[in-house]
Structures are given as C-alpha cells and as structure tokens.
C-alpha cells in the first residue's frame, strides 16, 4: 500500500459480528479469526468450540493452560507490569495469529482480565498484519472491548513497534498531573488509578 500505517481498516477487518461481552463471559471478537478475553474464557471449552477457536494465547504467568488436546496453546509468561518485555512477543504472537487464520482457525488471546496484556498483543497484530497505525488499531480494539487499557510500559513498547513497522508514531506519551500517559488516555487521566501502571 502507498501509505503504510495510515490505511483505513479493510472490509475483512470490519466484517466480524459484534459479540456482547456480558453475554459470553468477557470475550470480544476483534476480527473474523481473533478473539480477546479474560482468563475465565479459556476454561469454557463449549464457548471456545462454538466460536471456532483452535489456538489459545495465554498472556499470563498466573493462569495455567488447560492443555485440552483440541486446542494449540501458546504461553506468553508476562506480568501486567510496565517493565514487562511484552514487545519481545509481538512478532511471535502476531505471526501465530496470522498462521492460524490462514489455516481457517481462530485464536483467543487472553490474560487475567482481558484489559492490558492481551489487548496489547491484539493491537500489535493489527498493526503488523492489517497495516493500520497504532491509534487506529487501539481504537478498533477498544470499540470491540471498551474495558481495554494497556499499561504505560506496554504503550511505550507499542509506540516503538509502530516506529519499527511504519517509521512514525501516531500516539505520544504526555505528562499529566497523574503521571506520564499515552495521549489517548489524557482526557481520562483524572480517573486513572495506579493499577494501570502510572
């Protein structure tokens, strides 16, 4: 494409049906072959099979894999801490999601709450394989799962990844009375708590 990182979302990305988080216990459909959810979703074999999920990316250190034989498991052993090196896994996880999709499977990426670690990995995947900038990828995932809030350390790594992919960044870290946050959080910063890594 002529302007990498600034294209509009392709029709294939916009096509998936919205799934209510409340109806199915904390899962959201990000693309036709990618789901994002909290850790409890990974224990619901019926739900996983009903959604056509064949691969589970477990982005936690605290939740064990269930190791059911019908699913492929990928472990990303990270704490939800700003210093955790999630960027080391961006390419590996994105490549796996893409590979599963090409085989007509679907991937669930989960962490404990489905808010920070798993959302960060989904955003990185969208940048790499759907050729969208960081801001657009974040807005897309947030529209599907409004509770997402990657911690500030993960934002820094996403910004670096966007620069690596596209040579520029569409999100900046800014100083607020509550600490340094990504500019997409600036309007909400008075509501942020230390839990979010500020």
UniProtKB/Swiss-Prot annotation:
GO-annotated molecular function: MAP kinase tyrosine/serine/threonine phosphatase activity; protein serine/threonine phosphatase activity; protein tyrosine phosphatase activity; RNA binding
Classification via Pfam families: DSPc (PF00782)
Keyword DNA-binding on entry: no
Class in the EC hierarchy, top level: hydrolase
Catalyses which reaction(s): O-phospho-L-tyrosyl-[protein] + H2O = L-tyrosyl-[protein] + phosphate; O-phospho-L-seryl-[protein] + H2O = L-seryl-[protein] + phosphate; O-phospho-L-threonyl-[protein] + H2O = L-threonyl-[protein] + phosphate
SUPFAM superfamilies: (Phosphotyrosine protein) phosphatases II
Matches recorded under CDD domains: DUSP14
Similarity annotation: Belongs to the protein-tyrosine phosphatase family. Non-receptor class dual specificity subfamily.
Protein name per the record: Dual specificity protein phosphatase 14
Organism from which the protein derives: Homo sapiens (Human)
Lineage of the organism: Eukaryota, Metazoa, Chordata, Craniata, Vertebrata
Gene of this entry: DUSP14
